[in-house]
Amino acid sequence: MPHRGPVLIADVPDLEAVLRGCFLQDDVVYVTRYHDALAALTHRKYRLIVIGLHFDHSTMFELLRVIREHDEYKKTPVVCIRALPSRLTDEARHGIRHAMLLMGAQAFLDFPPGPAVAERICTELRRVTDEGVGGS
């Protein structure tokens, strides 16, 4: 698969290897702190942005808000994910998904822990981004 453009991933250090592995053909910028994400947004144009629920003490909502306020990123696909164990109820996860979509995310992908979770994460990220980005 040819290189399709830079991807910004904002999530916790524990998921870096897994999430980078989902985009082996892309130029990935991986950040673990909110201010690094803001700096990254000003230095390049990304074709896709992935934000984890647990990113920098749960600043996923704030980062998505800032991204959507940038004219340059109004149409950039943003996928939010939960890939670490949490104590959220089904209702809370549903509420987060609903809020993310209302705020302009393309999707909120929820991955409960279990066997082959890394493979499931990559499969779903590819599916959602291929549908929404169209390979551009």
Task: Please place each PLM-identified region on the residue numbering.
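Short beta-strand elements of ligand-binding domains
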Residues: 10, 76-83, 110
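Two-component/phosphorelay signaling modules centered on CheY-like receiver
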Residues: 12-34
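Alpha-helical interaction/dimerization surfaces of two-component signaling modules
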Residues: 18-22, 40, 99
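Output/docking surface of receiver
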Residues: 32, 84-124
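Acidic, metal-coordinating helix/loop segments flanking the phosphotransfer/catalytic sites
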Residues: 32-48, 52, 56-58
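Conserved phosphotransfer cores of two-component systems
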Residues: 42-44, 68-75, 103
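Conserved phosphotransfer microenvironments
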Residues: 51-74, 82-83, 88-95
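The C-terminal output helix
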Residues: 119-136
